[in-house]
């Protein structure tokens, strides 16, 4: 495939490519889409189901087949896929606190001038981003899968990047 043109408008970029199938050449349009979502969790930690916002971005993009990358743009926040079940979220809280307890804050070398070393570790465990396939204009999830924003050092605005590529 060979790119022959590139133009951009608003949040969208269109890459036109040529491809040959059985001696015929056709031009296809590959779109990209970018949007930032902002969150301000009022507590130190929390989980937000952001699937509806991601689905809205997908509708906005017009992409029917492709991939979506969703990533936290802060080092004490996470984006992950799991079930939207409150008991599971409580289990995450307990498990993460056992792995990287907030207190005593003096146990961490990072805590010089701040007390969020545990939040960095929790983010590392839960992950930075997810990639989801788009099929027929929909997120191609398994049973019960949803996309979550995980906050581990809240009480301020943080961004999540949504980036899509497809046609």
Which residue stretches match the model-derived regions?
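Active-site histidine-anchored catalytic micro-motif
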Residues: 3, 17, 21-167
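Short N-terminal alpha-helical targeting/association segments
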Residues: 1-7
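Serine residues within intrinsically disordered or low-complexity segments
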Residues: 8-10, 19-20
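Intrinsic-disorder-associated, low-complexity terminal segments enriched in Asp/Asn/His/Tyr and depleted
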Residues: 5, 12-15
